[in-house]
Amino acid sequence: MKTSDYKALSVEEKVLEVVRNFFREEKEGNHHARDHAKLSLQDYLVKTDDGSYTLNSDILDGKSETMHTRHGAVREAMEKFVKPAKLDGKDNVRVLDICSGLGYNTSTCIDYLSDDVEIELDLVEISKETLTLALLMYSSLESYRFIQKAVEDELYEMGDIKFRYYQDDIPDNIHINLYIEDARVVVKGLEGYKKYDAIFLDPFSPLKSPELYTNEFFMHLKNLLKDDGVILTYTSAAPVRAAIVKSGLHLGEGPSFGRSGGTVASLKEDVIDKPLSMDDERMIALSDAGIPFKDPEFNDSYQKILQRRDQERMLSRGRIRFSSTVKTPIYLNKELDDGRLKRRVLNNLKKLGFDDLKSP
């Protein structure tokens, strides 16, 4: 897969430079390189409400966002990913953590499960520098040291660091595999090879990283699920949910925490605790907001994916789909008392050939 024109959004460039300096100093034999990097990183850490830390993304289209909600990075991992994954009671668990970042989702998962559970954790992170940040971060999570050990071992084998400081072995029941690669390449390679109880999908927001929320990406994720497995993501964006529907998966509301409620998807409908509301279903099915991201060659840049969707929305709006601006689909077959809103909704309806809100 060619990705020469593809640059994934990552943490801010100044943080990446801290990591690169750390690599250089340690390769030169400086035993204090890691301490220097930890000190330099302090200037960029963002403390969240639960006491855990996150970082800002690089600037894209004039804006930046944090890697985690400011309401609590670790609590978000627990409430939006680990708990709704329904891993309780399983003796063997396999989890795919896409855009694993600092490793919070994975370490929270380890802490949550019993010590006698056999756990296989596949972490996917395109940015080696972002993955390295786990070595420079402090976390109160008991199992975070296992993530740090796995990252340290991987970087040592790759020749990026010269010293190993984590001496304790990872417990025999915990198996951590790192994939430092474009997630699109990884999921294609895993098909026919592995099936997962849970897939944590945790990229930056859909408009920043649409390549990991496309029709095609969810089709590949679908093929990686066990029969009762779930895909979990923090976003409730309409194009993301539309792509899930297009892939043939059942979906529902994920738990709310900080940001709006997330999304849960599964092969089986009875795995979904809370179906989407009728309003959400209508907006996805009938408005231009429900046009999903598409990546037919499975190697496009985020710019091309966004442009493709924008063009499709423009062509469909007022022709085969309602404009999403006044949320016309949610008012179908209802009475509207607000005169101004009613005029706007009726104008939208007439563009598609309907006379009023109760037209057949």
Protein language model regions, located:
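SAM/dcSAM-binding transferase cores
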Residues: K2-E13, E17, R24-K27, H31, ...
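The AdoMet/dcAdoMet-binding core of the Class I SAM-like
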Residues: K2-K14, L87-K194, F200, N215, ...
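Class I SAM-dependent methyltransferase Rossmann-like catalytic core
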Residues: K2-N92, L102-D115, T132-L135
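A short SAM/SAH-binding and catalytic strip from SAM-dependent methyltransferases
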Residues: D197-E211
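Conserved beta-strand signature within the Rossmann-like core of class I S-adenosyl-L-methionine
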Residues: A198-F200, D227-T235
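A short glycine-rich, Lys/Arg-flanked "PGG" loop and its adjoining helix->strand segment in the class I
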Residues: E211-D227
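Conserved Class I S-adenosyl-L-methionine
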Residues: R241-V264
